[in-house]
């Protein structure tokens, strides 16, 4: 059965509920909030031995596509793929995603480059997977709302002639496990292995000499930042030319406080669900401290997309989910083993490979600006090549998501321009020396 590990009671911490299908290629489809997940997303019983090995692939019809003058689809031709990665426990895991071959020519130096894009927060239900959103950019049903808001960044890269591979992350889309939201190792490994998988696809125009970039904002910013840190040890064969990390949740203790009580309070449930699945120390603490309302919320959130979570749990305080009336952050902080487990998720303890552009909105109160800035400081102290960009905007509303989302749009052009310069082989210089003067 499909184990969905939601932190509830000791009797149900590993399988809070089961979907009506096998984790392998069985006859019964998995249905998440009324959406039938294609059988493609059911992992096989046996996985390849090599990280990044392609398990299967198929054509992916893009929901937003037009015929070009030369007959080729614009902005490109997409392939849905499943590939092998390694999770935070060191176990083999199947991950899905998509590769898009652009119709536009690459006009920079060298062969066509590749960007591995890590999506921002989309939810924890399998129907929220970024690869499914490429096919259905706006999915509205009586039970769920999914919006493929990363399409703009993806298509802008494609229009520049850059090939793009998108990861669905561990457990998002694939029906055998729960999505481990903001898990440092899971997301970093999945992004790096997506690069490896893209190079194996038939018909892909990228070559072994193609430059590679990592790109992500919010959850995706954490994933790209993590991947840049992990590359030298986990994937030295992936040659990085640049990494964009926008609004990265590098310090989850601070980020939990920002999310709690916000419009995106449901994301707190996603992180707790994922860590309870992956880490016994956190699971034990959650089981001992979550009340009946909290158990129900964690289970309900585990199949939600962002829109569902905003409607279902917007502005909810996690103190309503605990037996003590304390916030989940305070509960974890009071338990040394649980806090240590959360601290292991900290990004900034390793030097990233290659140049990194880190952007953060100074008014961001969801993924707090201060912890994102601290990541830049931490990297600079390690001698990394960091371009830090503080996005100065007025306060657009406390806890409404606007302070977090608006910089995603306003900074996107500069982020893509910086990335394409790196992919063209242009040099960059760190502005770490300006950090004492930067907000």
Predicted regions, residues:
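Short alpha-helix in the alpha/beta-hydrolase fold that links the catalytic acid
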Residues: 227, 354-355, 368-379
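Catalytic-loop region of hydrolases
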Residues: 22-110
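Short, surface-exposed "cap/lid" segments of acyl-processing enzymes
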Residues: 87-96, 100-161
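Alpha/beta-hydrolase active-site loop
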Residues: 159, 181-203
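Short beta-strand/loop motif that positions the catalytic acidic residue
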Residues: 214, 352, 357-364
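C-terminal catalytic histidine-bearing segment of alpha/beta-hydrolase fold enzymes
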Residues: 339-340, 380-439
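Accessory cap/linker subdomain of secreted extracellular hydrolases
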Residues: 249-349
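Primarily recognizes the serine-hydrolase "nucleophile elbow" in alpha/beta-hydrolase
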Residues: 196-267
């Amino acid at each position: 059965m499909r184990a969905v590990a939601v932190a509830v009671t000791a009797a149900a911490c590993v399988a809070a509920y089961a979907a009506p299908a096998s984790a392998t290629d069985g006859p019964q489809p998995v249905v998440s909030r009324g959406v039938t997940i294609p059988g493609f997303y059911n992992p096989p019983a046996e996985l390849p031995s090599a990280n990044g090995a392609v398990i299967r692939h198929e054509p992916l019809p893009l929901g937003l596509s037009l015929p070009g003058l030369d007959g080729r689809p614009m902005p490109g031709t997409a392939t849905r793929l499943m590939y092998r990665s390694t999770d935070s426990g060191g176990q083999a895991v199947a991950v899905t995603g998509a590769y898009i071959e652009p119709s536009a020519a690459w006009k920079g130096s060298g062969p066509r480059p590749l960007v591995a894009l890590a999506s921002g927060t989309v939810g924890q239900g399998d129907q929220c997977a970024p690869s499914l959103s490429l096919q259905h950019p706006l999915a509205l049903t009586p039970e769920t709302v999914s919006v493929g808001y990363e399409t703009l960044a993806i298509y802008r890269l494609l229009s520049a002639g850059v090939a793009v591979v998108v990861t669905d992350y561990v457990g998002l889309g694939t029906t055998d496990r729960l999505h481990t939201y903001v898990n440092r190792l899971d997301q970093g490994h999945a992004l790096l292995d997506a690069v490896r998988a893209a190079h194996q696809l038939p018909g892909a125009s990228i070559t072994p000499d193609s430059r590679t970039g990592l790109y992500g904002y919010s959850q995706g910013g954490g994933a790209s930042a993590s991947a840049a840190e992990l590359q030298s040890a986990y994937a030295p064969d992936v040659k990085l030319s640049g990494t964009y990390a926008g609004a990265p949740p590098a310090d989850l203790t601070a980020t939990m406080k920002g999310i709690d009580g916000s419009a995106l309070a449901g994301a707190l449930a996603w992180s707790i669900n994922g860590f309870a699945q992956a880490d016994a120390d956190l699971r034990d603490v959650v089981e001992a401290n979550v009340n009946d309302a909290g158990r129900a919320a964690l289970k309900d959130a585990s199949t939600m997309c962002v829109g569902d979570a905003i409607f279902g749990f917007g502005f909810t305080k996690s103190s309503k989910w605990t037996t003590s009336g304390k916030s989940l952050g305070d509960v974890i902080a009071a338990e040394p083993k649980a806090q240590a487990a959360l601290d292991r998720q900290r990004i900034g303890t390793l030097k990233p490979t290659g140049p990194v552009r880190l952007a953060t909105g100074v008014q961001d109160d969801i993924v707090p600006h201060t912890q994102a800035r601290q990541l830049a400081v931490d990297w600079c102290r390690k001698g990394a090549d960091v371009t830090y960009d503080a996005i100065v905007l007025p306060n657009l509303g406390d806890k409404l998501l606007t302070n977090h989302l608006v910089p995603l749009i306003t900074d996107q052009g500069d982020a893509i321009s910086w990335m394409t310069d790196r992919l063209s082989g242009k040099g960059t210089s760190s502005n770490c020396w300006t950090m004492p003067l930067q907000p």
